[in-house]
Regions:
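Conserved glycine-rich Rossmann-like NAD(P)H-binding loop of the short-chain dehydrogenase/reductase
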Residues: 1-12
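The beta1-alpha1 cofactor-binding region of Rossmann-like NAD(H)/NADP(H)-dependent oxidoreductases
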Residues: 7-8, 25-37, 72
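Conserved mid-core segment of classical short-chain dehydrogenase/reductases
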Residues: 35, 58-76, 95, 99-105, ...
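Catalytic Tyr-X3-Lys loop
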Residues: 57, 68-88, 112, 136
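Active-site helix of classical SDR
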Residues: 90, 132, 140
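Alpha-helical segment proximal to the catalytic Tyr-Lys
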Residues: 95, 145-146
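Residue(s) in the substrate-gating loop at a strand-loop-helix junction
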Residues: 116
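C-terminal substrate-recognition "lid" of short-chain dehydrogenase/reductases
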Residues: 190-214
Length: 214
């Protein structure tokens, strides 16, 4: 089940993925919206075994800029979606995962969150974004410990500079220095490289409570 806010984008993605996929429209910050999405997923696929939290936004603004103090609403919105939205989805999904028939090692589900290297190496103007992603990193281990009794693993991926729609909106003047900062290879990460790590996390049943920089 692909969860999106934009219906047109969701339809295009499902069409490209082919059979065995569906989409639901939901706002990750809204409890009722996420609950409805989870119900739709269970009705369509019979249960929830894997959740990958990818919803996120960025907002570049210095703490004090030429127009004054950082707009507080920008900060709140980024934290609301990136951090609180992630927690909202995983907490509600975990309830349903707990109803699954345990598999190998008693596992009932896997949750993969998305942070960012900005959680560790935030740049100028990234206070809100870095704080939100650091929050995702910080809650990974405690939540993994919380959900261990239910047979649910929780891990987080902290991607570097990836070829995403958010990055596509940036100018070459912004993108080029970021690419130059990477060690090797000096290019943007690819979506399939992120997906490959998600697949490994799901398949490696001994991996839990960890944040992996990619």
């Amino acid at each position: 089940m692909l969860v999106e806010l934009n219906e047109d984008n969701a339809k295009k993605a499902v069409e490209s993925l082919g059979d065995g996929t569906a989409f639901a429209i939901a706002n990750v910050t809204d409890e009722d919206s996420v609950t409805d999405c989870i119900k739709a997923t269970i009705e369509k696929f019979g249960g929830i075994h894997i959740v990958v939290n990818c919803a996120g936004i960025g907002s570049a603004s210095k703490t004090v800029g030429k127009d004054g103090a950082h707009p507080l609403q920008y900060f709140k919105t980024v934290v609301d979606i990136n951090l609180i939205g992630t927690f909202n989805v995983l907490r509600l999904a975990a309830v349903e995962m707990g109803n699954n028939e345990p598999g190998e090692d008693g596992e009932c589900g896997v949750i993969v969150n998305t942070a960012s290297v900005a959680a560790f190496d935030g740049q100028i103007g990234q206070a809100g974004y870095s704080a939100s992603k650091a929050g995702v990193v910080g809650m990974t281990l405690p939540i993994a410990r919380d959900l261990a009794r239910m047979g649910i693993r929780v891990n987080t991926i902290a991607p570097g500079i990836f070829d995403t729609p958010m990055m596509a909106m940036a100018s070459d003047q912004v993108r080029s220095p970021l690419i130059e900062m990477t060690q090797f290879p000096k290019r943007l990460g690819l979506p399939q490289e992120y997906a490959s790590l998600v697949k490994h996390i799901v398949e490696n049943t001994f991996l839990n409570g960890e944040t992996i920089r990619l």
